[in-house]
Structures are given as C-alpha cells and as structure tokens.
Amino acid sequence: MALVSAVPLDSRLCLCRTLFGLTHELKAIRRTIPNLGMCRGGKSIAPSMSMSSTTFVSSEDGVPRRIGGHHSNLWDDDSIDSLSTSYEAPSYRERADRLIGEVKDMFHLISVEDGVSTSPLNDLHHRLWMVDSVERLGIDRHFKNETNAGLDHVYSYWTEKGIGRGRESGATDLNSTALGLRTLRLHGYMVSSHVLDHFKNEKGQFTCSAIQTEGEIRDVLNLFRASLIAFPGEKIMDAAEIFSTMYLKDALQKIPPSGLSQEIEYLLEFGWHTNLPRMETRMYIDVFGEDTTFETPYLIRERLLELAKLEFNIFHSLVKRELQSLSRWWKDYGFPEITFSRHRHVEYYTLAACIANDPKHSAFRLGFAKICHMVTILDDIYDTFGTMEELELLTAAFKRWDPSSIECLPDYMKGVYMAVYDNINETAREAQKIQGWDIVSYARKSWEALFDAHMQEAKWISSGYLPTFEEYLENGKVSFGSRLTTLEPMLTLGFPLPPRILQEIDFPSNFNELICAILRLRGDTQCYKADRARGEEASSVSCYMKDHPGITEEDAVNQINALVNNLTKELNSELLRPDSGVPISYKKFYFDIWRVFHYGYKYRDGFSVASIEIKNLVTITVVETVPL
C-alpha cells in the first residue's frame, strides 16, 4: 500500500518524445534519483532490524516521504566475484557423465527379475529407495525414464493394504507403504491414504514398540513424510502426522546426535511445503549412507553420493556467471541508487536456483530474480515512497506502453519503468523461441493487473477505508505479485505452454487462485505488524477482525493460519490429481515457486529481513561447495 500524500505535481501535458536519447537520459536519471543514505560509497552498511516504526525523510526533491527502514543489499560485487569456479573444468563434467551411466546401469540391475543387487523379498522397497534417493540428492533429472519404470513396477503390486518390501515378501510393510504412498502420489499415481488404516490397532491408533529401534524410527519418519502429502478430508493423514510428529520429537530426546537425528530435525522443521529441493540436497548429502537398516550395496551408495556432490559443485561455476550477469543488470538500470527500497536480487536468484538447478534453465533463474526484484521495488514505491499523484502517473504510463511516457514520471521512477518495459520484451523474445507466439500482450495484462491492485490499496489508505476480508483478499491475491513472478519465467522453460494448459495453471484458475490466496494470507500473518507501523492498516488480519467484532488479534491470526492449512491441502489435491489434464511436471514449477515464497515467510518476512535464514540459505546453496 502507498503513502497518501497531497503533494502537488506539475500537471501540465507531458510532451512525449521519441526513443532517441533515452539511453543518455537514463544515465542522467541515476544521478538524480533521491538519495536517502541507505548505502555509503557503494558499500553495504550494517543491516537494520528495526521494522517497528515509520521513518519520514525529506528527499532531494523537497517532498516529505516515508521509507520502510529496510537493511541494504547484503551481497556486493566482491561477494559474487569470490564465488568458486574450481569445478568448471571439463574433467568434472566428464566424470559426472560417467557416473550417470553407471547409475542407470544400477537402475537396470534392480529392474531385472531376481537380479544380483535385489531379490523378490525387497525389490519394491529397493526401487522406491532408488527413486527417493536420486530425488533428494538433486540428480533425478538424469533418471526420468528409470524413475517412471520403477514406479510403474511398484504400482503394479500396490494393493488396498499397501505393499511389502518385495513382491514376494508376503506381509505389508509400513516403511515401504508410507514411502510408496508419498512417492507414487507425487508422481501422479492414484493411491488412497486408506492403506495406512491397516497399520493401526484395534483402537484405531498407530502403535509403536516400547524400544525405539533405528528401523522403527525410519518407518515412522517415512510415515511423517507421507502424511504431509494430504488431500482435503483425509483424517487418516492428519492422524498420521500427529502421531509421527510426537514420536519423532520423542525419539530426538533419546537418540545420540547422528545423521538420523539431523534428518529428523530437518524434516520436522521444513516438512514438504517449505522444503526447497537444493536445500534438502545439501542436508541429505551430509547424512546419506548412514541408513544401516536397508542393505543396499556399498557401490550404489558410493556412486550416488559422488554424483550428487559433483553436480552440486559443478553448478557453482554457472552460479557465478549468472550472478555476475544479474549484478550488471541491477547496476545498468540504476537500482543501487534507489536506496529507499529492498534489494534482494541475489536472494531471489538463490531461491530460483533451489528449485531449478538444471543448467539449461538459466533464463528461468535470471528471469525469476529480475521480476521478483522489480516487483519488490514497485511494492516499496507503492507502499511507502511514492505520492498518490506519482503512483497514478506511473500506473497510467505503464498502460500507455510507450517508453517516451517516462517523461511524465519523477526521476526515481524512470529507471524502474524502463527495467519493466525492457524485461517484458526480453522475456517475450526468449519465450517466443519456445512457445511460438508473442507473449507481450499476455504479460502486459498481468503487469497492469498488479499496478491496478496496488492503486486500489493506495485508494483505501487515502480514504481511510478498511475493506472486508473477502474484498481485501480478492485484491490481495493480485497485489502480492506471485502470478507475475511465476508466469514470465515459466514461459522461458523448455516445454510449450499452449493456451489450454495456461488456462489450467495461470490466474484465475483454481490452482493459481489457491497459490495466490495462501501466499497473501501467509505473508500477512508475518508482515501485518510492521506494515501497520508504517501506516498500512489493511491486512487480512485487520480485515478479519473487522468482519468478526470482538475477536482478538491472536485468534484472528490463528483462524487465518487454519484457513491456510486447509487451502494448502486443496492445493496438494489440485497439483497431484491425475484427472486434471495437465501434466504434474507443468504445475510443479508453479508449485515450487509457491514453496519458495512459503519458505520466505516461515519465520518472519524474510524478504524484508533477509539477513538471517535466507542469508544462510544463500551461503549453503550457492556460495559454499561440498567436499568431495
């Protein structure tokens, strides 16, 4: 939401000029953007954690403005230039490719009836373990065919009671059934959660032995992982989550520090919805191979682990080049001079890398980082820095879709406008190579919707109007900006998105509505106090309290969190239902972007205070390599 200011602007007609000279003009603009002193000499100052009050400043143009007190950019050029490129030598890629071939051979040996590496007493669990391992180690993109073949085999033996460890093992097995339920669901197989009923006692409760063995703990750990892939109305999954959570927390008090305890702590902390793939890979590399309850040949574990480490480290050389490119873009459009705003382009790139580490997805990673950064800058302009008159000019200028429209704008807005304009055209050129159609008008409409939603919030502040919860949420689903940060980068991926599929996954489809609603609600529960301190009264919390007189703030937050949990189960169902007509792989990128933002709001507004959890995420996933 925006600062409401009645500062008059010169309203005379803006004379639109040609594109000639705009490049020179942008350089001049960077020298005249209001400087509020958040950075000194191009260096970051110590981050400020205070988000509790509004700061009023008088900028160089003499207009009193608000700033949010956000800490400055944490990652300067020196940080980026210091990143390792020691694994870009061709020999590492050649070694990784040889290992990929060896692992494919291992998949083949498992698929052979009565093969030397498996038996009919454990072949189902072995297949599931292989699929689960390559996914958690971040190398699954190399083994799509092997994964599909393995899961087809497991599914052919699936029963209403689940499965045993092998096709001839006789009795069903909790570990194999829970891992199978989770893995098969995530790959679009129709499997019922009622298989878990067969692991409850006559009282309808999950049971455990008096002595917690490592094998039983791992059984329950996979039960916990499965319980998170829940659909609406699945009470058995709720019961499984409650039981397994209590069991694992109790186990942590009894077992010594180990790879198993580290894995339990990690999964209890991040579950599925805030568990980013590359972040999990970094954890799993450290603990992989310590499971002594399942007899897998040492050679298989050794090869999988070596390949995972190589792929993790090889990616770092690409990261450095992409971050250097991103930093040049950030400086070329004069963003460092916009000192009143948050600068989180490196953090956004990291989040993209955590869900898309395939080298060929460079356009996705950079596109996501750029769009998120621009949406953040615009959010800070509309929320605090801009006057109402300036915001109206910016919104109107964008809808004219003419670079000469920047003549009408205050200097600090001109570079932002050109960054958005150029980025849409650049993305459109990349997308057209893949999609075969011009996405400019499609992208413009989504940007226009964002500008309109921000303006609506600004008008609410201007008039002192507090909307109803429903009214606020309908607008907030758009103003959050998640559609934009998803749509354009998605269109640069290497698969076509025809209109039929876009209608199923883009806003306002039910799938995308759920994503937008959850993120708006989750973001509000973490941001509403800081927003209110900056003069932004309307949030899902305050609007819910308006609709329910007498309810406390704490109860309102709890009700919204409960709503988020219910909507999340609906989202699970929308993502994984086999009858949707849209491949899960298409929806998975949308869903993973949702997980990225969900992670960012897990503890606080991690995009405003990025110096804690997300800073650590940058360090462990894109800065540091793993020892071979």
From Swiss-Prot:
Pfam families per UniProt: Terpene_synth, Terpene_synth_C
Listed pathway(s): Terpene metabolism; oleoresin biosynthesis; Secondary metabolite biosynthesis; terpenoid biosynthesis
Binding-site list for Mg(2+) 1: D379, D383
Required cofactor names: Mg(2+); Mn(2+)
Keyword field: Chloroplast, Lyase, Magnesium, Metal-binding, Plastid, Transit peptide
GO MF annotation terms: magnesium ion binding; terpene synthase activity
CDD domains to which the protein is assigned, alphabetical: Terpene_cyclase_plant_C1 (cd00684)
Known EC number: 4.2.3.-
A GO term from the CC aspect: chloroplast
Protein localization: Plastid, Chloroplast
Annotated Mg(2+) 2 binding sites: D379, D383
Entry annotated with the keyword Lyase: yes
Keyword Disulfide bond (UniProt): no
Superkingdom classification of source: Eukaryota
Sequence positions that bind Mg(2+) 3: D531
Cofactor note: Binds 3 Mg(2+) or Mn(2+) ions per subunit.
Function of the protein: Monoterpene synthase (TPS) involved in the biosynthesis of monoterpene natural products included in conifer oleoresin secretions and volatile emissions; these compounds contribute to biotic and abiotic stress defense against herbivores and pathogens.
The protein's name: Monoterpene synthase like 2, chloroplastic
Organism name: Pinus banksiana (Jack pine)
